[in-house]
Regions:
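Extended acidic/polar, glycine-enriched regions
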Residues: 27-69, 107-109
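Extracellular beta-strand-rich solenoid/capping regions of secreted or surface-exposed proteins
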Residues: 33-39, 83-97, 105-120, 128-149, ...
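N-terminal domain-start segments of secreted/luminal proteins
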Residues: 60-96
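Short, small-residue-biased leader/transition segments that mark boundaries at the very start
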Residues: 2-6, 162-166
């Protein structure tokens, strides 16, 4: 099994550093503004240099093995980098796969209609440029009349809400 070494240089004080969840019992060594710790297994953790404020969320995953071919005509493939699909909208139909590679940030909403649709990858679907109910779709992922819709591993940044301003 592989071990991962993480080093983080923080502008915030590390005097009250928490690494959560506690079940992983991660005890970093701290030298001035650098915290160092090791992970022995895939996990998602919150690195909190100033208690619960300003966390750094780390998704430490197994290596991805089920990557669709970017040459497959039924695959819409976004590689690493920022992507802005036309009109901020991705339409998926039957037997299509949307793949967001690790490091991809796709600024869009999705409309899916049909059978055997897959949305996957380690990338980010980002709807934060739009206010709630004002994006290219009513919902960030708008699935209608779908059978066997599979969504796995993507990270979604949802449409923003102005409720906090009220």
């Amino acid at each position: 099994q592989r071990q991962m070494c993480i080093r983080d240089r923080s502008k915030l004080s590390l005097d009250h550093l928490n690494i959560l969840p506690d079940k992983y019992a991660i005890h970093p060594s701290v030298n001035k503004d650098i915290a160092t710790f090791h992970l022995n297994e895939p996990c998602d953790i919150s690195f909190e240099p100033d208690g619960c404020n300003s966390p750094l969320i780390l998704f430490c995953n197994e290596l991805e093995t089920d990557i669709p071919s970017k040459n497959d005509p039924n695959v819409i493939y976004f590689g690493p980098g920022e992507h802005n699909p036309e009109n901020g909208l991705i339409r998926l139909g039957s037997n299509q796969t949307l793949y967001l590679a690790g490091g991809a940030v796709v600024n869009a909403g999705i409309e899916a209609t049909g059978d055997n649709i897959t949305i996957c990858g380690r990338g980010i679907l980002d709807g934060s440029d739009w206010e709630h109910n004002a994006g290219p779709t009513d919902y960030m992922i708008n699935a209608k009349n779908c059978n066997n819709l599979v969504m796995r591993d993507i990270i979604c940044l949802l449409y923003t809400s102005d409720a906090a301003d009220d």
